[in-house]
Amino acid sequence: MDQTEAAQRWLGIDPGLAIIGWAILDGQPDLSAHLVDYGIIETSKNLSTPERLVEIEQDIHVLLEEFSPQAIAMEMPFFSRQIKAAGGVMQALGVINLVIYREKSIQPVFLHQSSWKCHLGNGKANKAEVAAMVQNFFGLEDLPIDDSVDAIAIALAGLNGVRNDIG
């Protein structure tokens, strides 16, 4: 992309069943990035998995309608020991992927956690370190240390061309 091209809008997603982080960035690869908005989607543990998935579907629909992203980057979770959690997260990931494709015909870029963290400078950074790097990059005074921070970093990595051979 050259400097004369318009900025592209990216949606970054840190998927989960209980909490989904999301962030919207506008920018051009390696030139500029503007943080438009970010937040989390939470589903109640008191709901059944199908009810939580419906809530996720509806909330992702709202994000897509409100922000109209042109590209999407999502973390591809890795599970080594948390097999029970993996099922719910992968179901949520499937619903998110379905809604994105159904409504925007976009195939998300899937990134391993170590890939998007390396883009910030430390592939093993914890959430507080990721928050500090994101806060510094965007010149933010305050930033919550939650899943939205990861989503900001995921969107930034996607915007700047980080890719994995997965998907």
Swiss-Prot record:
The entry's keywords: Cytoplasm, DNA damage, DNA recombination, DNA repair, DNA-binding, Endonuclease, Hydrolase, Magnesium, Metal-binding, Nuclease
Concerning PROSITE patterns, the annotation shows:
RUVC
Does this UniProt record's set of keywords contain Cytoplasm? Answer: yes
Q: How does it assemble?
A: Homodimer which binds Holliday junction (HJ) DNA. The HJ becomes 2-fold symmetrical on binding to RuvC with unstacked arms; it has a different conformation from HJ DNA in complex with RuvA. In the full resolvosome a probable DNA-RuvA(4)-RuvB(12)-RuvC(2) complex forms which resolves the HJ.
The residues that the entry says bind Mg(2+) 1 are 14, 147
Name one process (GO BP) from the record. Answer: DNA recombination
Q: Which gene encodes it?
A: ruvC
Copy out the cofactor comment: Binds 2 Mg(2+) ion per subunit.
Write out the annotated subcellular location. Cytoplasm
Enzyme Commission number(s): 3.1.21.10
CDD domains per record: RuvC
Molecular function GO terms recorded: crossover junction DNA endonuclease activity; DNA binding; magnesium ion binding
Please list the cofactors this protein needs: Mg(2+)
According to UniProt, the reaction catalysed is: Endonucleolytic cleavage at a junction such as a reciprocal single-stranded crossover between two homologous DNA duplexes (Holliday junction)
Pfam families cross-referenced by the UniProt entry: RuvC
Give the binding site residues for Mg(2+) 2.
75
User: What is the official name of this protein in its record?
Assistant: Crossover junction endodeoxyribonuclease RuvC
Task: List, from the UniProt record, the residues annotated as the active site of this protein.
Answer: 14, 75, 147
Q: What does this protein do?
A: The RuvA-RuvB-RuvC complex processes Holliday junction (HJ) DNA during genetic recombination and DNA repair. Endonuclease that resolves HJ intermediates. Cleaves cruciform DNA by making single-stranded nicks across the HJ at symmetrical positions within the homologous arms, yielding a 5'-phosphate and a 3'-hydroxyl group; requires a central core of homology in the junction. The consensus cleavage sequence is 5'-(A/T)TT(C/G)-3'. Cleavage occurs on the 3'-side of the TT dinucleotide at the point of strand exchange.
Homology family: Belongs to the RuvC family.
| A GO CC term attached to the entry | Holliday junction resolvase complex
